[in-house]
């Protein structure tokens, strides 16, 4: 069976608490069943109280953290041109990087491309 979870705020918690993504007290549960696939959207939540510079900084810190944790945990962070068919045919655990609050763009249109290059596939405004 394939599982697709569209939203998980654990990334924000792990980054701000400087903890591991698979901390047992968090919501993340890795798929250990070789016959199923799990695609998780990891959302970095950016509080409205942050100014644009702070939100942008937290975004880039979170992007580095997610990449590192995906490598450590064997999660395939899907990039440009990779979609759910790849996730469900090739990888047991895969991820999309998402952003909850467009303030992370910090008013810089060039950040749209930069975010996409870092794997962002969904962003709320």
Label for each model-derived stretch:
Residues 1-125:
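N-terminal hydrophobic targeting/anchoring segments and the immediately downstream early-domain regions
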């Amino acid at each position: 069976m394939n599982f697709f979870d569209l939203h998980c705020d654990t990334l924000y918690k792990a980054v701000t608490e400087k903890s591991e993504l698979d901390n047992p007290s968090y919501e993340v549960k890795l798929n250990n069943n070789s016959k199923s696939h799990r695609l998780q959207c990891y959302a970095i939540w950016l509080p409205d109280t942050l100014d644009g510079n702070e939100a942008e900084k937290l975004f880039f810190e979170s992007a580095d953290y997610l990449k590192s944790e995906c490598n450590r945990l064997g999660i395939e962070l899907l990039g440009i041109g990779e979609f759910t068919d790849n996730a469900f045919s090739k990888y047991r655990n895969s991820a999309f990087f998402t952003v909850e609050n467009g303030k992370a763009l910090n008013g810089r249109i060039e950040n749209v491309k930069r975010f996409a290059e870092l794997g962002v596939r969904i962003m709320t405004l």
